[in-house]
Amino acid sequence: MKPSNFPMPTVDAVLAKYNLNNRYYDFSCGWGVRLLSALKNRVAYFGTDPNYELVARLKQIHQDYDLVNSTISSVDIRATGSEVFHPDWENTMGVAFSSPPYFDLEDYRIGAQSIRGRDYRGWLGEYLQPTIDNIKRYLVPGGHLIVNIKNYGDYALYDDTFSLCESSGLTYVETLILDNITRPSAKQDINTDEKIMVFRHGDTEKSSPLDLFVF
């Protein structure tokens, strides 16, 4: 398995369904697909990524987009990991949605990457847990945390992320299925579908884990 670009139609669908207050936090910015979806859908975009060179390029994408489209978009991207808390974002975000870095798979060598100097348990405790805790503080009541991640190899990334979200007091809502055949690196003869977990900050009627919606 190797990293691949995230399909923009999925981001569009998530924002259409879960955009609560027009403020979207992308906790692992990646190569800009989620940023472009936010720009296209006129949603204020807030992002973190430790790769400072990537952050500079994303800011340039924002400037170029506004120049070409004669728009004034709201974008705030910070060159930190998502485990770093930003007090001015507390209780402001309606939705947090991203595909976080996979342990031992995605290390882009620039900035304070989440895997550096950590084994898997350290990554869970020092990166993923504080990331979830921060997002819970960023979300307004009724806001949603939406995570696209999957188990791979010996690492139960999906299962452990799900457990950490529940133990943090977030309420499970539903599971979406990303038909990953739309990704550039997907192979036609291999099922690479991925689950997208949805949690809510605050009480809600729980869905069954079998209630799936396919993008």
What is the predicted role of each segment?
Residues 1-215:
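Class I S-adenosyl-L-methionine-dependent methyltransferase catalytic core
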